[in-house]
Amino acid sequence: VDISFFMDRELFDREYQKLFRETPLVACLSTDLPEPCTFHAYDDLDIPIVVIRGKDGQVRAFLNICPHRGARVVRTESGKASRFTCRFHGWTFDTTGKAIGIPEEAQFCGQIDDRKQLVPCPAEERHGLVFVQAAPNSVMDLDTHLGQFGAELDRLGLAQAVRVKDDEVSVRSNWKYTI
């Protein structure tokens, strides 16, 4: 194998975009979001994402970035909350990502109308897992992605799985080396 297969930055960037941004990845177990208003935040792929089970029981994912000034909205890995407030200027969002509180909103003179929502990412709950695609404006086709593997996932009974331990291993290498 040619060494450029592992060292070419342009190739790496294309692979990273395709594999880790435009592909559905497991964000968490369904049991990590056991009831309405529970959330799980992560930024394993250098994009901060928060997955929220809404008051309606629906799972949604958003960039964990305040649309006002780009600060993190959710600062803890997991928990329960019916609203999320950015520490920077106090913008507050509900479990659907909609802004429900913007301090001194009138002073913006309507210039923030397009920023009154957290940026959504495609998310879907299946087989006891929550899948998220880290490309906000993309379309996630989970059935095509999983194919026949979906039936295999069902047989694992992951809907009842409980997280026992979290371990993180950080390796500075091309993703192909770690596989």
Where on the chain are the PLM-derived regions?
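Glycine-rich active-site/cofactor-binding loop and its immediate structural neighborhood
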Residues: 38-87
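Rieske [2Fe-2S] iron-sulfur-binding subdomain
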Residues: 1-59, 92-179
